[in-house]
Amino acid sequence: MKNKKLLVMAGGTGGHVFPAIAVAQTLQKQEWDICWLGTKDRMEAQLVPKYGIPIRFIQISGLRGKGIKALLNAPFAIFRAVLQAKKIIQEEKPDAVLGMGGYVSGPAGVAAKLCGVPIILHEQNAIAGLTNKLLGKIATCVLQAFPTAFPHAEVVGNPVREDLFEMPNPDIRFSDREEKLRVLVVGGSQGARVLNHTLPKVVAQLADKLEFRHQVGKGAVEEVSQLYGENLEQVKITEFIDNMAEAYAWADVVICRSGALTVCEIAAVGAAAIFVPFQHKDRQQYLNAKYLSDVGAAKIIEQADLTPEILVNYLKNLTRENLLQMALKAKTMSMPNAAQRVAEVIKQYSN
């Protein structure tokens, strides 16, 4: 009997791509074939084939920040992308399509509707992006990570890597820690410039009380090392973190942005967090962070309010006991079966 096939529509950032990979791998274990639809110039083009998943491309890009010419050409570009996606769908003959966000999802979702293929949509953020708002009107089923993006969609969490759930629980991790509090600073793959420029001034005041690890992002090690100056030996600086599960588990508290995937990873491992949301116009990261801050698992410091003094005052008053309580609360908010639940819905609605 022929295997069923899923076409994944996701691209642009890790927040869209990694959860989609988790769902794809879940279905691969159940004898499903997977094909990916993306764009050639975004991260999925290099990343997805490393997981043994074939990928095909359409031409589409975002309009934010583009000039008037791009806006005038947009209807033609979208129409062309829909036709390209329709041709690929007719060739691949998927039993369902999964939309996980990114520019590619829009025209590909419309093409799937035209071809009569069931559309399962997953919104990773606490507020839906424009593409998913529009696709939500034609999707067969809409799922969401947080309870605030769509009024009536099922809340399933964000599919995250399984190794995060395999870490010991916070009370076990914290049980033999008596040394300095451990602070992990995560800037993400691009690095968070505001964190890179603020933390050296924080470490200068707290290096004798706290232990720091700082992931600074691509190409930023030299610049940030210079900012640390004479305190450089007091902090471990890395460009990337290869083993995020281990890094989260090492930390007593994590300072980071609050992208949807990061928030769900922190919940999965059970870690206390200080979130500095990126200043989106739609407050996307702030609303993601509230998922944990509202239950006392995290502290939010708005970027406009972030100063070395505010961070120093907050950090120096922390104890391992209150960080453990925050970590335990974060763990209660995790949804370990997100990838499996999305996979179940895909199977339920597939042709």
From Swiss-Prot:
It is a peripheral membrane protein. GO terms for biological process: carbohydrate metabolic process; cell division; cell wall organization; lipid glycosylation; peptidoglycan biosynthetic process; regulation of cell shape. It holds the Pfam family Glyco_tran_28_C. Pathway: Cell wall biogenesis; peptidoglycan biosynthesis. Its main location: membrane. InterPro entries: GlcNAc_MurG (IPR006009), Glyco_trans_28_C (IPR007235), GlycoTrans_28_N (IPR004276). CDD domains: GT28_MurG. One of its GO terms (cellular component) is plasma membrane. GO terms for molecular function: UDP-N-acetyl-D-glucosamine:N-acetylmuramoyl-L-alanyl-D-glutamyl-meso-2,6-diaminopimelyl-D-alanyl-D-alanine-diphosphoundecaprenol 4-beta-N-acetylglucosaminlytransferase activity; undecaprenyldiphospho-muramoylpentapeptide beta-N-acetylglucosaminyltransferase activity. It is found in: Cell inner membrane. Keywords: Cell cycle, Cell division, Cell inner membrane, Cell membrane, Cell shape, Cell wall biogenesis/degradation, Glycosyltransferase, Membrane, Peptidoglycan synthesis, Transferase. UDP-N-acetyl-alpha-D-glucosamine binds at T13, G14, G15, N125, R161, S189, I241, A260, L261, T262, V263, C264, E265, Q285. It catalyses: di-trans,octa-cis-undecaprenyl diphospho-N-acetyl-alpha-D-muramoyl-L-alanyl-D-glutamyl-meso-2,6-diaminopimeloyl-D-alanyl-D-alanine + UDP-N-acetyl-alpha-D-glucosamine = di-trans,octa-cis-undecaprenyl diphospho-[N-acetyl-alpha-D-glucosaminyl-(1->4)]-N-acetyl-alpha-D-muramoyl-L-alanyl-D-glutamyl-meso-2,6-diaminopimeloyl-D-alanyl-D-alanine + UDP + H(+). Its EC number is 2.4.1.227. Belongs to the glycosyltransferase 28 family. MurG subfamily. Cell wall formation. Catalyzes the transfer of a GlcNAc subunit on undecaprenyl-pyrophosphoryl-MurNAc-pentapeptide (lipid intermediate I) to form undecaprenyl-pyrophosphoryl-MurNAc-(pentapeptide)GlcNAc (lipid intermediate II). This is UDP-N-acetylglucosamine--N-acetylmuramyl-(pentapeptide) pyrophosphoryl-undecaprenol N-acetylglucosamine transferase. It comes from Haemophilus influenzae (strain ATCC 51907 / DSM 11121 / KW20 / Rd). The gene is murG.
